[in-house]
């Protein structure tokens, strides 16, 4: 078998406090995250937002030790996956490709070429597809592929989504079972799935399958778990004034407390490794909200990290992909046929249907409101502590 390069896609995270500002800048400079009517404003606005949010974000990272463990854990996952694939007689080398912090996608591509890789499998470390996560990373990889003849010649396969893979579901269920069994009354402990949210317009206007995959995944995990515990699915990490997927985690926690729920097992469903959203947002912020609402036993299921069952499921995904056809990254990033996602260089702005729909009317209104708020010094972003 030819030499296979496994590209593990992930978000990236600041490893030191001084990295927080540059990381945020890279994040908000991505047109997949914020699309502006005038492209020249992208970088200035990214600088402004990252500057305004740096102090608050730095405080959050200080509370978990001064930086994100995401790169360290992703590197461990890469090593474990590479080792297992080689045990299965697959001549594979893994490469970590972060979207917004080191090691960037360009580094992974350069390393693969230097190592003489002969074919590529792209594996997002996002179980559920979204245009803002896997989609953005696919597009970045495709951009590099189009500008690099040698890289473009390599046969490539990409795994778009794996939220329903039996091995992944089993790994999640096993970790949940341990926390449920540790409750005073395991049979009545309330299972609380918390997924990273996205703006509602992504789903309703652009046709992003993320919500559908999250909901299906939660049901499949509970079916795999084989228990009758009551459960809830909510969405966390909302920022800004626009409407995101609901119910919001903080509001759902308060509601469960009001209903008398005492034992809660929180499951970070869309996260495969520990990072700021699990260690700070769930473990600190949401724990406090739940406790104040009356929950007396707040237990959080650990992220998958290098769980053997999880790593084995990733290896299964790679082997299945290698046995299948090559994949075009543009097709891997595509949305349902009912909505056309235009190439970034052809996106238009305005009230017509040729605009990028999920960045259309809401974004236009949001951008106008943002400018007004910057000038006035008052508004919802100030109330939320974002400005």
UniProtKB/Swiss-Prot annotation:
Keyword tags: Cytoplasm, Heme biosynthesis, Iron, Lyase, Metal-binding, Porphyrin biosynthesis
Catalytic activity, as annotated: heme b + 2 H(+) = protoporphyrin IX + Fe(2+)
Entry-linked Pfam families: Ferrochelatase (PF00762)
Record's GO cellular component terms: cytoplasm
Molecular functions per Gene Ontology: ferrochelatase activity; metal ion binding
Record InterPro entries: Ferrochelatase, Ferrochelatase_AS, Ferrochelatase_C, Ferrochelatase_N
The organism's place on the tree of life at top rank: Bacteria
Cellular localization per UniProt: Cytoplasm
Binding residue positions for Fe cation: 196, 277
Predominant localisation class: cytoplasm
NCBIfam families: hemH (TIGR00109)
Family in the record: Belongs to the ferrochelatase family.
Cited HAMAP family: Ferrochelatase
Protein name: Ferrochelatase
Gene: hemH
